[in-house]
Curated annotation (Swiss-Prot):
This is Putative 4-hydroxy-4-methyl-2-oxoglutarate aldolase. GO terms for molecular function: 4-hydroxy-4-methyl-2-oxoglutarate aldolase activity; metal ion binding; oxaloacetate decarboxylase activity; ribonuclease inhibitor activity. Coiled coil: none annotated. Homotrimer.
């Protein structure tokens, strides 16, 4: 498991990285994570999140544009545990999570806006692997995202931690 330090990556690659507006908090069991972006665009329906975490996620980060909704959670303990089991590096969720006491013990990175106890509807609605924009940054499938307790950054290509 690679450890990333976003300030060091920003210093080493100032012309390459974009920094998200500071609105995310770390809810996962991994303080730092990074990988290739897979995107979902949805609103108060985590059906596509459930589908993706059931797939192999080695080297990948699921970026979920939940429209910034603070009315329900797009990720809970069961989906986080599936993501960890299937090798996902982490999830960046522009929305809420729940079961936070379990998430912090799960071996997957999770950055989200807040916690909320209500689950989503399951209507099968959402778009996979489309460009999504939130927190002042556009996430494109196949690009790279890195996160730690300092923040979240995006790069068009993979980054190596400086020595």
């Amino acid at each position: 498991m690679q450890h990333y330090v976003t300030p060091d990556l920003c210093d080493a690659y100032p012309d390459l990285v974009q920094v998200l507006e500071p609105m995310f908090s770390n809810f996962g069991g991994r303080d730092s994570f990074g990988g290739q972006i897979v995107t979902i665009k949805c609103f108060e329906d985590n059906s596509r999140v459930k589908e993706q975490v059931e797939l192999d996620g080695k080297g990948k980060v699921l970026v979920v544009d939940g429209g910034g909704s603070l009315r329900c959670a797009l990720l809970g303990d069961m989906l986080a545990e599936k993501a960890a089991k299937n090798g996902w590096e982490g999830l960046v969720i522009y929305g809420c999570v729940r079961d936070v006491d379990v998430l912090i013990q799960t071996s997957v990175g999770v950055q989200a806006l807040a916690s909320h106890p209500m689950k989503t509807d399951k209507r099968g609605i959402g778009d996979l692997n489309v460009a999504v924009t939130f927190a002042g940054v556009t996430f494109r499938p196949g690009e790279y995202v890195y996160a730690d307790n300092n923040g979240v950054i995006v790069s068009p290509s993979p980054l190596e931690m400086p020595q």
